[in-house]
Amino acid sequence: SRFFGDLGFYEIARVEDTLVFMENRRDGFGAYLRDLEKTRTEGKSAALVMNANPFTLGHQYLVEKAAAACDTLHLFVVSEDASLVPFTVRRKLVEAGVAHLPNVVLHDSGPYIISNATFPSYFLKDEAAVIDGHARLDLAVFTKIAAALNITARYVGEEPASQVTGLYNQIMCEQLPKAGIECVVVPRKEANGKAISASTVRQCLQSGDWDTLEMLLPKTSLDYFRSPEAEPVLARIRNAGNVVHY
């Protein structure tokens, strides 16, 4: 890292001697933290991070559970544009789907939480050892964000289907308590005896199964996908082939 420091890179976080996260702006992360600090509140603050590709009734249930258990819920939407549903749409659907919860503060994750910089294997589906290192680095950055916002708990949805997210959750529950942050795993909301998942929603959008979508999406997301505005996104999903891990 000293070599990159000489080239004008600045360290943000490191995992022992295996990984270092650096950026080429002197105050990029500092400015991001100062911006976040404007939304810092007294009382119990918690965090939730979601990709929401797209925002489902499962996501809404998770946000409602977390919001009910704290004074302020900081909800970070993954802003890396590596998903079938573009970030601008994902954020809009999250915002619409949580509008009834006054104590939820929405944030963009920027390049600092689950991004190609901190956690590339989230998008690449790498092997376990690589995922482990990237997850630890991502969480090392997150603990600095948590300190800026006085966050003492992070909520996650139970993850039976995805190896990457399941491993990330496991490492989170090991690492965050060391930084004084409780890790709360919430059982998934079900429809017809199955956990609601965004991958099932993408499959239904691809095949045009609107009956199933009515059971999986909040009205706000459903209205969007039925509108002419959604046509470019639907075309992208229809043409994507395998949409399960996307």
Show which residues each predicted segment covers.
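Nucleotidyltransferase catalytic core that binds NTPs
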Residues: 3-246
